C-alpha cells in the first residue's frame, strides 16, 4: 500500500469541467482575465447572461462562475501562461470550448507568487501544478541569477546574469514571481512580457505538443536552478485551504508584498523534501537529500505496506504498516549516502571567490539571512542552528585533525629516535646502569588511542585505520529489537558505539557484543561518519525476524566521561537514566594511580566534545528525541547489561560484594578503589565473571573465583545495572532472578587475603565510610587456620530454609554494629515487626519423576497453599530456587490464592502434560532476631569466627543433602546458620525495634493457661516456617490461644510469637517435653519471654517437623515418672536467658563406632526413617550394653552411615535389615547430638491423609487415652529373627485387632507393650520416652476441658499428635504400678466408639476381668507388653486358650438386663470421656528398634 492521504476539502475536490458553446455570432460569452504577465492565474471574469441562463448559447454541464481559476482550456494546461496565450487557445476552438476550473480558496487563489512560494511534496497535485506554472513561464521568460556564467551557458537563454544590485532592483519592482537563494546566489523567475516578443503567440498545437512530453523549446536549466525550485517542500494539500496561513520566505526582512515573493528554496541540492525557514519543517524533509536529483527525478513508489500521510500542519510523514510505526524519514532514501561536510564545495564545484556564501551547504542545511539575527544556518536533520558555516567548520576541524595527526606522527618519530638513541647508548655503555631516559613516556604502538589525550577523540572513516580487535556478529531482530543501545554520532566525525545491552536481548544472548564497541559496518555498509539518526533508522528499517551482519571494533573508549553530569543528556530510551561506562581494559585511561601524568588530559576529554550540551539542548528544544535512540523497541523497565574490565591490584579488585537483598546473586556492596573500579557502581549485580555465569553460585564460590585470579590479571565482569528495586510488597517483579540466595554476607574483594575470614573483634574496626584497602589488613589471617569455608556447609545452607535471611549480615561481615543497624533500617526491615514478602517467578522443567515438590494446604476455604517437601535431586531441588514453605500464588498464570487443594493439583497435572510449569511463589523476606553479644558468625557468611573451627570431616556428608544437615540444629553443630542453636549458630539480623519482652500469665485452680506450644524440630526445610531460620534459632512458638483462657485474657500473647524462655530459663535447646515440665512446675503463674512473631505460621500451618501440645490442663507442679536414661545422658548445657549462644563443645563433631553384638543385641534403639520424614537417631542405650560400654554413643546422636551405607532417605526397615545382616559387628558413622531426640509427629507421615500436615488439629491433654502408633518399637534381641518388615505387618497378626480370628502364636511383643489392631490402627506403646508419660491428675484435669467430638479423620490426626504430649507419656509410665482396676478402665476396648455389639463385647470382657485378676492380666495388652519375662512366662497358646474360653463363657452367661445396665454405666463414663472414633489401620506403626 503506497498512497498519499488527502483531505476531502482539498482544492482538487472542487475542480469541475464546463463546456461552453458559442453563440450565433460566434461569441463565447466568457471573459478571461489575469495571466502570468500580471502575476496571476487566468481566471473567469464576466459571464454572459445567455450562458448563465442556459439558453441556446448556454453551456452543457456545470456553469462557470465568476472569479474561478482556469486550469485547462480545451485540454491545454494554462496555469502560468500569459493572458494572450490563453486567449489564443480559446480562439483556436470553433464551436464549443471545454474549461477546467476551480473556485479560489485560501491556498489556491489567483496570485501566482502566493502559490509558487509554497512548498509541497513531490508527486502531489500542488507540486505538479507548480511545475506546470514554471514550465509555462519558461516559454516566455528566462530566469535570472547573480552567479557567474559557467562553461556552456548562454546568457539570455540559460540565465540572465545580473549583479546583486540589479537583481534586488528587479525584485523590488515586482517583476520576479519567484525569488530564492541557493549556495549564496540569488535566483529569480521574472514575469512574462506583457506582449509577445515577436508579436506571435504560441499556437495550441505547439502547447499540446510541449505539454505532452516534448520540452525541446523549454531551456534546459542547470542543476542549481532545478534544485532551487525543488528545494523546499511543504505538505499542505491536506489542509483546509481557508484556514491555512500564507507561508512566506525568510529571504527578506520586509513583511509586505515583497516578503510574499521570497522563497525558501535555498536548501538542499539533493532533494524534493526539506528545507524552508518556516518552523513547521520536520525530519520528513531531510531524507531525499542524499543524491542530487533533478526536478524530473522520481524516487519511485514507496515500499510495500508503507503509506505517506500529512500532519495537521502539512508535514509529511510515513507509516510502516509492517511494524505499525511512523517515521519522519522517507524509506526510499535511507540507503543513500550523505555527502560529508568537509567534502562539500560551491555550486557545481566552481569557485569564483573564496566566500562563505559561495560554499555548497551540505544536505539538510539551510542558510537564513535574518535582519535581526543576521546570517545563521539551520540543520534540519538534527534540528539545531549555528552561526558558523558548517562546511567551513568541518573543514577547519579536518585541518585541525590533520595537524594533530602530523604532530602525533612527529612525536612518534621523535620517540622512535629517542628510543634508538637510548639503545645505541645502552650498547655503548653496556657495563653501566640503565639511564634515566626510561622515565620518558615510551612509544605508543597504538597512536589512535592517544588522540583523546590531545583534546579530541580519534575518528576515522576508513576502517583500515582503526586500531583494535574486529568482531563480526550476526543478530536476528526480535519483536523487542536487537537488544542494544547506541551512543555517539552527534557529529559526523564521531564514532557510533554500543552503550549497553538489554538483558535477554539478541545481543546479550549472542555474547559477542560489549559496551564501548564501535559500529563499523551494518550489512557490509560502512557507517563510520553516519549520524546517530541515520544508523538507528537503518536498524529500524530491518523487519522483525530478519538478520543483520555487524562489524564491530573493540578498543576505543566511549567519547565522554561517565562521571560527567552532562552525560545525563545522552540517555537511552530503553534504559532510563543509566550512565555509560568506559570498559574493555582501558587502563591507560582508567587508572590515574598508574598514569598520573595523563589524568588531567583524560579528565579533560569531556571539554573536547564537538557537541556542547547547549547544542543537545537546542536539539531537544526543536522537538527531536534524545540523541541516543533505543534499538530495543522501548523496553522502558529492562535493566541493562554492562561489561566492565578491572585489573586486580596489590590490594585486590577494590570492591566488596554481598548477597543481593532480592536474590539472584552477588551485588557490588562497596567501591573501595574508585579509580580501579571505574565503570562499576554500587548495587551492580554480577552476572558473569570472565564469561562464566555466577548468578547460581553461592557467595563463597564467587569469592573463591575472584581470589584465584592472580594479581595484575584483568577480569571481565558482566554486571546488571538498574531494573527493579529491592522487593518489598510489590507484585512479582523479579523475572531476572536466577537464585534466591538470601544471606546477606558481604565480601571484600579489595584484598584477596581478607576474603577468607575475619573475627568479630576485627569487624568493628572497619570504618563506616569508604575505607582504604589497607584498613582490612588485620583481617587477613584466621587463627583457626581455615582458609576456605566448609563446602558442605555452603551446600547444605543453600538447600535449606536457613538461608532465608535476605538482610542478615553476620557480625564479621565487615560492618560495625551501628552500620548493620543503619543498613537494616535503610531497607525498612527493622522498622516493623511484620516481615515483608517477596514474590518470585520460578520456571521448572519436568523430569521423569515429576517436578520434585509437594503441595500442602488448601483444605479449607481461604487456607493458603504452600510448597511442602522438596524431593532431593528432583527438578525443584536441581533448580534451587523453590523452597519448602513458599506460599503458592499462581500456577502458569492462574491465581491459586484461596483456591482448593484439588484445583492446584489439577493445574499441576495440566502442567505435567506440557512438561513445564511457571510458579509464582511468595516468601517472607526477613524475620528480625535479637542480636547477641557473643554471637558466632554464620558459616554462610564470608567470614568465619576464629573460635569456631568447622569440622572438615563434615565434607563427607556432602551427598547427604540438606536433610541430615538440617538436624544439626538441636546438636549445635557449626554447620547450621541458626541463631543460638549451637556453637555454629550465628545471628543474622540486628533489630532495634523488635525486642523480646516478658509475659506473665496467671491461671486459676481449675483452669489451664490456655495456649498451645508448637515446636519445630529436625526438618525445617519440609515445613512452612516462613521466618527462615527463626524456627531453628527459636523452635518453640505459640500455636494457638484458647478463647477465654488466661493466655487470651492477658492480651499479650499472639499466635506465632516465639518463646525464648520460661520462668527465666532459656528453652532454645530444650525439648518439647522439657518445656511442658517447666510450665507444669511453674504452678499457677508462668512467665514467658516472647519475641513477636507472625500469625501466618500458626497452628493451621503445622509442618512435618512440628508437634503440638496444649497447656490447658489444671496440672500441679508435681511431676512423676521421668525417664532416667534421657536425663542422665543429656550432654547439652542449658544456656542462660541472656540469650547468648551456647558455647561450642568438643563433642560437636562426627565419629565412628564399631559395636560387637552382645547377648541382648547391640544395646541401642533407633528412631526415624524416610517413611516418617525423619533422619535416624539413637533413641535409647541399653544399660551395660555394647553401645553404652563403647563410651561414644549418646542418645540423640544422628546416624549417618550404617556399615558404610548412607542413611540419607533410608527407611527404618532398611536400617534394621542392615544391622541384622551385618553379623556380629556393626559399624556406625554418627553425628553428635545434644542429647535430645527429635519427636515424630505421625500426622506428618506420608501414609496419612493427602492433606498432610495442614490437617493437624489442636491436641489437648484430655481424656483421650487411646494410644497411637509408636515410633519406638524396641525389640528384644531374641525377636530379631523376624522379618525386617514385620513391624509393618504386625497388625495383621494381632488377635485383638480382629474379631474373627484368635490370637496368633507368633505375636511380637515389644517393650512398649504394643498390641496392634487393624481395625483401629492403634498401637499401645507402654514404655515410651519421658515426654510421653502423663500423671493421672493432669489427665483428669484435661478431661474437664471437654475436647469436642471430632470426625474419624480429625480424631486420627489428633491422637497421633496427642501421643507426643508429656502427660500421655507420664501416664504410660504410671500404668506399670497402678491397680488392675485402673488398667481395666484404660482398656482400649473402652475407648472405642461404641456401637452396641462392640460395647457388648467390651462389657463382657470387663466383667470377666473383674472376676479373675489372673485372666485380667492375660487379657490386658499393657501387661503383656510390659517385660520380656512376663511374655516368656505366658505362652501364646495359653493366652489364646484363656481368651477364647473367657469369651465363650461371657457370651453364654451374659444377660440383657445386666448388659443394659453396664451400657448405661459406660454411657455415663463416655459423657466424661468422649469415645474415640474408629480409625483405619495405620501402616508402619513401629519404627524404633532396640538392637
From Swiss-Prot:
Q: What topology does the record note for this protein and the membrane?
A: Peripheral membrane protein
GO molecular function: any one?
alpha-actinin binding
Location of Phosphoserine modifications: 357, 730, 741, 800, 1071, 1361, 1412
Q: Which InterPro entries match?
A: GK/Ca_channel_bsu, Guanylate_kin-like_dom, Guanylate_kinase_CS, P-loop_NTPase, PDZ, PDZ_sf, WW_dom, WW_dom_sf
Q: Does RNA-binding appear among the keywords?
A: no
> Which residue ranges does the record assign to the Guanylate kinase-like domain?
96-287
Composition bias (Basic and acidic residues) maps to 1278-1338, 1354-1396, 1403-1491
**What SUPFAM superfamilies does the database record attribute to this sequence?**
P-loop containing nucleoside triphosphate hydrolases, PDZ domain-like, WW domain
Q: Cite the SMART domains for this sequence.
A: GuKc (SM00072), PDZ (SM00228), WW (SM00456)
Residue stretches of biased makeup (Pro residues): 435-445
What top-level branch of life does the organism fall under?
Eukaryota
Identify the stretch(es) annotated as Interaction with FCHSD2: 970-1066
The UniProt entry lists the main location of this chain as other
Where does this protein have compositionally biased stretches of type Low complexity? 411-421, 742-752
- Tissue specificity field: Widely expressed with the exception of skeletal muscle. Isoform 1, isoform 2 and isoform 6 are highly expressed in colon, kidney, lung, liver, and pancreas. Isoform 5 is predominantly expressed in brain and heart. Isoform 3 and isoform 4 are highly expressed in pancreas and brain.
Subcellular localization is given as: Cell junction, Tight junction; Cell membrane
Annotated ranges, domain PDZ: 17-105, 472-554, 643-721, 813-895, 970-1066, 1124-1206
Q: Which GO terms describe its cellular component?
A: adherens junction; bicellular tight junction; cell junction; cell periphery; cell projection; cell-cell junction; cytoplasm; nucleolus
Alphabetically, which GO biological process terms does the record hold? Answer: cell adhesion; cell surface receptor signaling pathway; endothelial cell morphogenesis; positive regulation of cell-cell adhesion; protein-containing complex assembly; signal transduction
Entry protein name = Membrane-associated guanylate kinase, WW and PDZ domain-containing protein 1
- List the source organism: Homo sapiens (Human)
User: What gene, per UniProt, encodes this protein?
Assistant: MAGI1
